[in-house]
UniProtKB/Swiss-Prot annotation:
Keyword field: Acetylation, Nucleus
Recorded name of the encoding gene: GON7
Superkingdom in the source lineage: Eukaryota
Subunit structure, as described in the record: Component of the EKC/KEOPS complex composed of at least GON7, TP53RK, TPRKB, OSGEP and LAGE3; the whole complex dimerizes.
Protein name: EKC/KEOPS complex subunit GON7
GO biological process, one term: tRNA threonylcarbamoyladenosine modification
Annotated GO CC locations: cytosol; EKC/KEOPS complex; nucleolus; nucleoplasm; nucleus
PANTHER family: EKC/KEOPS COMPLEX SUBUNIT GON7 (PTHR37363), EKC_KEOPS COMPLEX SUBUNIT GON7 (PTHR37363:SF1)
Role of this protein: Component of the EKC/KEOPS complex that is required for the formation of a threonylcarbamoyl group on adenosine at position 37 (t(6)A37) in tRNAs that read codons beginning with adenine. The complex is probably involved in the transfer of the threonylcarbamoyl moiety of threonylcarbamoyl-AMP (TC-AMP) to the N6 group of A37. GON7 plays a supporting role to the catalytic subunit OSGEP in the complex.
Annotated organism of origin: Bos taurus (Bovine)
Region (Disordered): 50-100
Coiled-coil stretches noted in the UniProt entry, renumbered to this chain: none
């Protein structure tokens, strides 16, 4: 018995993951499956760990100032967005000034 998985990256590159489910000295098929699932989990963690590291390096290389900012949004957009209504269907959340 074995577990198979396939990861397709953003560029369309395929990577197959294959893990045998035979643990040495284990005769129970469920224990063997559990061992295989644990191994698959480790493979997936390694795969995504390397993907995350590569993406982080790409971001720093592409735009070091933006990567250090920690804000993925456009800063000029924040400055121009002064109307922060949450409910456009209802009345304004601001208190109306009464004439004195």
């Amino acid at each position: 018995m074995e577990l198979l998985g396939e990861y397709i990256g953003l560029e369309g590159r395929r990577q197959q993951l294959r893990v045998p489910c035979e643990a040495p000295g284990v005769t129970d098929p469920f224990q063997s499956l559990l061992s295989g699932v644990a191994q698959m989990r480790e493979l997936v963690t390694e795969l995504f760990g390397s993907q995350v590291q590569q993406e982080a390096q790409d971001r720093v290389t592409a735009a070091p100032d933006e990567a250090l900012d920690g804000d993925d949004e456009d800063d000029s957009e924040d400055e121009n967005n002064t109307d922060n209504r949450t409910n456009s269907d209802g009345p304004s959340a601001k208190r109306q000034k009464t004439p004195s």
